[in-house]
Structure formats: structure tokens, C-alpha cells
């Protein structure tokens, strides 16, 4: 959807779950959160919220005021998400486009803030899902560190972005199995292993069958979210929603 008003076409055709980006369409069209939700108020499916990305960084070790401000914004986002009845809010543990000047200190700062946010989320009865973000030297956590994050913080859950994991060369099926019941959602999209293209499933170089097998092995409930580029035709999105359902039911 290139424009926010185009979502009516989707809402008319889709009654399943939705993930709402708080940065707006294309991540660059600021919206009034309270006004914007009115268009989704009557939607029958479950709602998940993707909290803002830009200008926020829970891991800022050089400037504590940035990480503290980011915490306050995300706390407000959790409260808003709970207010509209969302079941889950997705958060990035760091600003993935920012170089890590002090990696260990940045990890500690992010973990401390995620612990605080997890406590808020628990009180609000909303799932706080932490996504794997950042590529190569810009990634705050590697694969093993990402798994340990959820061992250290019991009040958060894991969202595995399959496309991000592919670019970083992670063992995505193994990661899914290692996380087990701590996995609450997956972002499904494809790429060429180099750029974060958000292509439809099958449009890149990801080997999907091992991922489907790993997801089918999970016995708990989790969200399967198509996170395709905004210019993907609605017909493709709906077709692939059915494809995912078929694959996971095999």
C-alpha cells in the first residue's frame, strides 16, 4: 500500500490479523496514532503494532538521554497499543542503521531498557516481541546472543525476521527450533541475501522448505506475518497468505 487511504481495499478483502506500523505507510508518512486507529477499529482480526523505528535507539551507549527518551516513547507506544486492544507490539532493540561504537555497552543498555519495557508490557497484558535487526557489523546481537536475550528476559518474546536472518547468514530453521515457545511471531519475506528487499516468498534466494518444517514443528501459537514491500499487489499478498496457511498445515 503506497498511500494510507489504500488500506480500505485490504480491509474489504481481509479479515485476518494485521500489523500496524506506527511510522505510517512506507515508514515515512507520520500519522496521528489515535486518529489513525479509527479506520481499523471495526476490523475483526487480531491487531499487532510495529512501534516506531526512526530517531529512536534503546541501545545508545554514547548518549544516555537518547536511550532514555526512546524508552519513554516505547512505553507510550505500549500504552497506546494496549488501549486499542492490540495483542502484541514489535520493537527493535537498536537503531539498525546506526554504527555500534561500543558494542558490549550498547547491548547492556538495550537489555536494561528491554527489561523495563517487558515489565510494562506484562502489566498491560500485551506481548512485547523483540525483532532481530541490523546487518553484519550493524547488528546489535548475533544469532547466539539473540537466543540468550530471551533466556535473560522472561517478560519479552522473540520475533524472527526471516529476511534479516538470511542476510546475516543465520541458521533460520535452527533458530526457530532453539527459541521454541519463546517465539511469538515471524516476519516472512524474501531477498537476495544482500539487500533487505522485502520480496514475496519465492522471489529471492531463501530456501523455504526447511523454514516451513521448523515452523510446523512448533506446537504453540505464534503469528506468521507477511512483511512485503509496500508496492506488492494486494492479490499477491492475499494469495501468499493462503500459501502460508497451507504450508503450515501440512
Which functions belong to the PLM regions below?
Residues 1-82, 249-250:
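N-terminal pre-domain/capping segments
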Residues 1-6, 21-35, 57-61, 65, ...:
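Acidic-and-aromatic substrate-binding clefts and catalytic sites of carbohydrate-active enzymes
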Residues 5-9, 87, 140-143, 147-157, ...:
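Histidine-acidic metal/acid-base catalytic patches
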Residues 14, 43-44, 84, 123-124, ...:
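Helix C-cap/helix->beta junction micro-motif
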Residues 16-20, 47-51, 89-91, 128-130, ...:
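Hydrophobic faces of well-ordered beta-strands that scaffold small-molecule active sites
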Residues 37-54, 111-121, 149-153, 208-213:
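Alpha-helix-loop-beta-strand connector modules within alpha/beta enzyme cores
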Residues 53-58, 95-98, 190-196:
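Conserved radical SAM core fold
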Residues 64-157:
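Active-site acidic/histidine proton-transfer and metal-coordination neighborhood
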Amino acid at each position: 500500500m503506497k498511500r494510507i487511504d489504500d488500506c480500505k481495499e485490504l480491509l474489504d478483502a481481509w479479515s485476518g490479523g494485521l500489523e500496524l506500523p506506527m511510522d505510517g505507510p512506507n515508514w515515512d508518512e507520520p500519522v496521528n496514532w489515535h486518529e489513525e486507529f479509527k479506520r481499523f477499529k471495526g476490523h475483526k482480526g487480531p491487531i499487532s503494532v510495529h512501534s516506531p523505528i526512526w530517531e529512536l535507539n534503546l541501545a545508545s551507549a554514547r548518549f544516555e538521554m537518547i536511550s532514555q527518551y526512546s524508552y519513554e516513547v516505547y512505553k507510550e507506544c505500549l500504552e497506546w497499543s494496549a488501549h486499542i486492544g492490540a495483542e502484541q507490539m514489535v520493537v527493535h532493540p537498536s537503531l539498525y542503521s546506526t554504527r555500534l561504537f561500543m558494542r558490549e555497552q550498547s547491548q547492556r543498555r538495550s537489555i536494561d531498557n528491554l527489561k523495563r519495557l517487558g515489565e510494562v508490557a506484562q502489566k498491560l497484558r500485551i506481548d512485547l516481541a523483540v525483532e532481530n535487526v541490523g546487518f553484519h557489523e550493524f547488528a546489535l546481537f548475533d544469532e547466539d546472543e539473540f537466543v540468550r536475550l530471551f533466556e535473560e528476559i522472561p517478560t519479552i518474546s522473540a520475533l524472527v525476521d526471516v529476511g534479516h536472518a538470511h542476510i546475516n547468514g543465520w541458521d533460520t530453521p535452527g533458530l526457530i527450533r532453539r527459541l521454541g515457545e519463546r517465539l511469538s511471531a515471524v516476519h516472512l519475506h524474501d531477498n537476495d541475501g544482500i539487500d533487505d528487499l522485502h520480496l514475496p516468498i519465492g522471489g529471492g534466494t531463501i530456501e523455504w522448505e526447511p523454514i516451513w518444517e521448523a515452523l510446523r514443528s512448533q506446537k504453540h501459537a505464534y503469528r506468521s506475518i507477511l512483511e512485503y514491500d509496500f508496492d506488492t499487489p494486494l492479490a499477491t499478498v492475499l494469495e501468499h497468505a493462503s500459501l502460508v496457511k497451507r504450508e503450515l498445515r501440512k
